[in-house]
């Protein structure tokens, strides 16, 4: 159950980080209105708070989180931006998620 909780928390954390960064991108590059910076700031604050909820040491969380971030970012690319990832992108995601699994769930002696 801890693994499902951790994975779900990583996914939610990644979504809040991506939203918090994508909205300023829209403002800077796509002429979105300035008010989009308010939900962006709230999303990034939530991202930082969510990182504090993970059930292990901060450095390990940050290292493992990167693998899930890569996965969610490619889903964002596909679902939000409408760009289909290249097959090699999926290979990279698999490697990143394998690394996340090792970092988070390998037995510690």
Swiss-Prot record:
SUPFAM superfamilies for the chain: Multidrug resistance efflux transporter EmrE
Domain of life: Bacteria
Keyword Methyltransferase on entry: no
TM spans (from-to): 1-21, 33-53, 63-83, 87-107
Intracellular or extracellular location(s): Cell inner membrane
InterPro entries: UPF0060
Membrane topology qualifier: Multi-pass membrane protein
Pfam families registered for this protein in UniProt: UPF0060 (PF02694)
Family, as annotated: Belongs to the UPF0060 family.
The protein's name: UPF0060 membrane protein ABO_1373
Lineage: Bacteria, Pseudomonadati, Pseudomonadota, Gammaproteobacteria, Oceanospirillales
């Amino acid at each position: 159950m801890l693994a499902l909780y951790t994975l779900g928390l990583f996914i939610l954390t990644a979504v809040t980080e991506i939203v918090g960064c994508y909205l300023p991108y829209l403002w800077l590059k796509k002429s979105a209105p300035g008010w989009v910076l308010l939900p962006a700031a709230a999303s990034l604050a939530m991202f930082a708070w969510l990182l504090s909820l993970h059930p292990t040491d901060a450095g390990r969380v940050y290292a493992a989180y990167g693998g899930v971030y890569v996965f969610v970012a490619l889903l964002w690319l596909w679902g939000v931006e409408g760009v289909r990832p290249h097959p090699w992108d999926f290979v990279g995601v698999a490697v990143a998620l394998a690394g996340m699994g090792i970092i988070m769930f390998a037995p510690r002696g």
